[in-house]
Design a protein with these regions (language model features):
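Surface-exposed short loop/turn segments
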Residues: 29-31, 103, 107-111, 115-160, ...
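Sec/Tat-exported extracytoplasmic proteins
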Residues: 80, 85, 97, 101-109, ...
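Extracytoplasmic/periplasmic, Sec-exported soluble proteins
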Residues: 70-73, 85-97, 141-145, 168-180
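A structural "domain/chain start" motif
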Residues: 26-99
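Bacterial N-terminal signal peptides
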Residues: 11-20
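Low-complexity, intrinsically disordered segments with a bias for serine/threonine
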Residues: 9, 24-26
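Compositionally biased, intrinsically disordered linkers/stalks adjacent to structured regions
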Residues: 174-192
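Bacterial N-terminal signal peptides that target proteins for export
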Residues: 2-12
Length: 192
């Protein structure tokens, strides 16, 4: 009998350990507990709910309170992008945001309009960088130009239906903006 209870106890302990580990692995990683949230030079002032962002499929961080937007909404209007990054590169990257967002939202099946849209997309560039000096030549892919982007998506009544945050790299800053918005628009269509 004691051997049976030891085996039973060991089996319960193993099952408990498996359930505990699987619960931890299954929980989506949140932005608030990530290293990205601790970056001092990347403002977190544009989106209303940074604590609700979770790791996304295509975009780095996403929050869609009602799931996928593609079937529910048909038309979209993209506003000019803002920037709260401190560099000139951030300002320049913000100029490219609207055009690339419209391009990729159309490719995902949304109709881009100038007014009376089902969805209103607001964008922000929170950081943009261009490597300097020898880093550009000796740093490899890690030294490519990059950009940090945020999208706030509202329906026509002003209710937030999506928030996204993404860092992307490219051969130039405009290329990084396009790469980031491509991933973000895929997430908008999929709702994850």
């Amino acid at each position: 009998m004691p051997a049976f209870s030891r085996r039973l106890t060991a089996a319960f302990a193993a099952a408990f350990l498996l359930l505990s580990v699987s619960a931890v692995l299954a929980a989506p990683k949140s932005f608030a507990s990530s290293d990205d949230a601790k970056e001092k030079d990347e403002p977190q002032k544009f989106l209303p709910d940074y604590d609700k962002l979770v790791q996304g499929k295509d975009a780095d961080w996403v929050y869609f309170p009602k799931g996928s937007l593609k079937g529910t909404y048909k038309t979209v209007m993209v506003k000019d992008f803002e920037h709260n990054g401190k560099s000139r590169d951030s300002r320049d990257a913000a100029r490219d945001g609207k055009e690339y967002a419209e391009q990729w939202l159309e490719k995902e099946g949304f109709e881009v309009v100038e007014k009376n849209a089902d969805l209103i997309v607001e964008g922000n560039v929170f950081n943009a960088w261009e490597p300097s000096g020898a880093a550009r030549y000796w740093g490899g892919w890690a030294a490519n130009p990059g950009v940090g982007l945020e999208l706030l998506i509202k329906n026509k009544s002003g209710e937030v239906v999506g928030e996204l945050r993404q860092k992307a790299k490219g051969s130039t800053v405009p290329d990084a903006v396009e790469n980031g918005l491509e991933d973000m628009c895929k997430s908008v269509a999929a709702g994850k």
